[in-house]
């Protein structure tokens, strides 16, 4: 059995920087045509020059791959700065509520404050797309749900602004997407295939710790259903986020799952299991092209076959290991050719 996927798109990707970028980028740049690149670096991408520098670094270490750059939402995003970014091809803003995830200490503390709303008004006028880490302070399993009132306010106040709920994790958010024309979402492999049991049902597995948390069986099943039918307002976004094993095995575990090396084989396996392979093309590419109005992307054909793929346990960077999701397991699908 074989399947060919055309122009895969990852609508939410972390490729880090410097040596770590060089170590992990190929896992995404080789099989994917494009990816929306997250701006939460150690020094966040708060303006056009820093964003373009990072874009150049990615382009210097990849080929036939389009990084879709995003700006880190901050009070310095004046109308002039947004116009400058737009002129250079930057179309995405990423809003991090302060302290909600990795490198979000510089995030937005007042989501409905006057400055935030002013920036969103300008973003709407210029046709930016707003990607939001939709969590607010509260009980860990309810953080996305607690952000619903903010999402509704944004959707109603800025009806022409496309708003993406990144890494949808709570089944209660589905109704919001279906209610508001300008609300969309991305789904990760881990949120549609894993639950809290994978994180802490046995021994604690730090390599399954992410934000937002993987949640209950009901959440996983409802989100998987969206993916399997390639809901037109949903696109695939891996949120692949590598960390060194030494950090993952520390007393202060960073959030992030490194899934990039297995994404397409694992999705084929999952969709085949549920008799939905015919919808994988839409989920992995077609929906994103429509939602984000993407064209002129590098053309790619990725041929996968139903042959065993033993997932490596890790990859290396500067003699440090980075654990790979499902490392040591055997997947039933594997990439045979990328053209």
Curated annotation (Swiss-Prot):
UniProt superkingdom: Bacteria
Keyword Membrane belongs to the record: no
Top-level enzyme category: hydrolase
Residues binding Zn(2+) 2: 94, 133, 167
Reactions performed catalytically: (S)-dihydroorotate + H2O = N-carbamoyl-L-aspartate + H(+)
Binding site for Zn(2+) 1: 12, 14, 94, 239
GO biological process, one term: 'de novo' UMP biosynthetic process
Modification type N6-carboxylysine: residues: 94
Keywords of this entry: Hydrolase, Metal-binding, Pyrimidine biosynthesis, Zinc
Pathway participation: Pyrimidine metabolism; UMP biosynthesis via de novo pathway; (S)-dihydroorotate from bicarbonate: step 3/3
Record function comment: Catalyzes the reversible cyclization of carbamoyl aspartate to dihydroorotate.
Family to which this protein belongs: Belongs to the metallo-dependent hydrolases superfamily. DHOase family. Class II DHOase subfamily.
Subunit-level organization: Homodimer.
Stated name of the protein: Dihydroorotase
Origin species: Helicobacter pylori (strain Shi470)
Gene behind the chain: pyrC
């Amino acid at each position: 059995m074989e399947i060919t996927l055309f122009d895969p798109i990852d609508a939410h990707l972390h490729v880090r920087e410097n040596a770590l970028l060089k170590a992990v980028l190929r896992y995404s740049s080789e099989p994917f045509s494009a990816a929306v690149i997250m701006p939460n670096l150690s020094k966040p991408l708060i303006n056009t020059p820093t964003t373009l520098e990072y874009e150049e670094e990615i382009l210097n270490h990849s080929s036939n791959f389009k990084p879709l750059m995003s700006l880190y939402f901050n009070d310095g995003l004046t109308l002039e700065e947004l116009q400058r970014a737009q002129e250079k091809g930057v179309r995405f803003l990423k809003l991090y509520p302060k302290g909600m995830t990795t490198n979000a200490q510089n995030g937005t503390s007042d989501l409905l404050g006057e400055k935030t709303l002013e920036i969103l008004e300008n973003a709407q006028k210029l046709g930016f797309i707003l990607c939001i880490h939709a969590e607010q302070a509260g009980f860990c399993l309810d953080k996305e749900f607690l952000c619903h009132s903010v999402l509704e306010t944004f959707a109603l106040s800025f009806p022409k602004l496309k708003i993406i709920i990144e890494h949808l994790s709570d089944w209660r958010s589905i109704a919001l997407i279906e209610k508001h024309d300008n609300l969309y979402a991305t789904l990760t492999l881990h949120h549609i295939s894993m639950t809290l049991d994978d994180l802490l049902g046995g021994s604690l597995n730090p390599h399954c710790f992410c934000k937002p948390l993987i949640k209950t069986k009901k959440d996983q099943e409802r989100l998987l259903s969206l993916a399997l039918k390639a809901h037109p307002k949903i696109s695939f976004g891996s949120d692949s986020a590598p960390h060194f094993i030494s950090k993952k095995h520390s007393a202060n575990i960073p959030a992030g799952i490194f899934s990039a090396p297995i994404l397409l084989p694992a999705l084929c396996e999952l969709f085949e299991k549920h008799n939905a392979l015919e919808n994988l093309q839409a989920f992995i590419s077609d929906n994103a092209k429509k939602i984000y109005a993407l064209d002129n992307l590098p053309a790619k054909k990725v041929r996968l076959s139903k042959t065993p793929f033993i997932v490596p346990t890790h990859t290396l960077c500067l003699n440090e290991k980075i654990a790979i999701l499902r490392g040591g397991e055997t997947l039933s699908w594997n990439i045979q050719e990328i053209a």
